[in-house]
Design a protein with these regions (language model features):
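Alpha-helical transmembrane segments of multi-pass membrane transport proteins
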Residues: 1-179
Length: 179
């Protein structure tokens, strides 16, 4: 980004100071999110939320597939509204213990989680990658949505395949570990 700024706009002290101020503000917001997520995680651990969530799942008689479908829906909705870092910090402490307790592989869930957040990056209204593409290429929102829709559909099909056939995402890590 720095090289692009230098090539296209030149390097001036006014631009550097503005960039430093903006990056400081962005980093401050990120640090507040991380600190808030740390306290949120601590409260979740202290309140034993993961165990209580597991008990709710058992009491409702939800099958593991219904649980993962519910988690996928929650992550997709959150991906439309919140950035991936915040989603990760807020949901991982809740979902990972539940996933392990119902018998899913945590590596597989990690892949499913990343695919969900990738989908969130290209899903309106909060898709961060959409804002970046719209800004860089100066295209209309309609044109952008028309261009991203096929990729969004492919990602959703890919997510469904990974959920239906976990071996697709576990084969490579298994060969790396030697299993």
């Amino acid at each position: 980004m720095l090289i692009i700024a230098i090539v296209f706009y030149g390097l001036r002290w006014k631009g550097i100071s503005k960039s430093l101020i903006e990056s400081t503000l962005v980093n401050s917001m990120i640090m507040f999110i991380i600190v808030g997520a740390y306290f949120f995680t601590y409260m979740i651990g202290s309140a034993n939320i993961a165990t209580k969530l597991h008990d709710v799942v058992v009491n409702f008689g939800l099958s593991p597939w219904q649980v993962i479908l519910s988690i996928n829906i929650i992550l997709l909705v959150l991906g439309c509204l919140i950035d991936p870092l915040t989603i990760t910090l807020l949901t991982v402490p809740i979902f990972v213990p539940l996933i392990i307790q119902i018998g899913y592989n945590p590596i597989w869930f990690g892949v499913v989680f990343v695919i969900n957040t990738e989908i969130g990056l290209i899903t309106p209204p909060m898709g961060i990658n959409l804002f970046a593409i719209k800004t860089v290429f100066n295209i209309s929102t309609g044109e952008l949505l028309k261009g991203v829709t096929p990729f969004l559909m492919i990602e959703i099909v890919f997510l469904a395949l990974i959920c239906a056939f976990p071996a697709l995402s576990l084969w490579l890590p298994g060969t790396m570990i030697g299993g």
